[in-house]
Amino acid sequence: MDYTQEQERQAQFLADNGVDLIIGSYPHVVEPVKWITAENGDRTLVYYSLGNFQSIQNTVENMLGGQANVTISKEEDGTHISDYSLDFVVTHYEQRESSEYYDIVTTYPLADYTSDLAARHGMSVSGNEEFNLASLQGLSSQILSKCDLDESKEQDASKDELTDESTDESTDGEN
């Protein structure tokens, strides 16, 4: 689930023209979340693709979707992204015995999805052995390993460390 050079080129164009946040969706699969730098040094947060929020496609990759969580803060020095994350969702569909169609279609947070639900999923019932909870969790881990999700927390931590150090130094100077 990697973004293409064309997606990267378009994201860079938008960043260079002042866009702060890009949320993509087309390729039906979740792609990495990255920070990119504009020509002027500003940074843009890019969710290359959130995939499908709901779908009855027939691959594991198409059943896993993403949910962007972004906090935008307005302060005296301007507006900025103060927090962001990526949560995963699973499209679940199944068929009642009395129906010839998939008539139960819903979306679950991956964190709440169970092996029992996966066993009842239309893909599992139709014989797709690749569809199971472990494959969904593995795919989400693979995607997360390519994301820049810890960067804002690392920046916040380094700010805290600087604050703590400067506080310690000023306290030492006062004694």
Give the role of each language-model region:
Residues 1-2:
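Short acidic, glycine-rich surface-loop motifs adjacent to enzyme active sites
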Residues 60-175:
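A short C-terminal boundary segment appended to hydrolase-like catalytic domains
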Residues 5-66:
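Conserved beta-sheet core of the metallophosphoesterase superfamily
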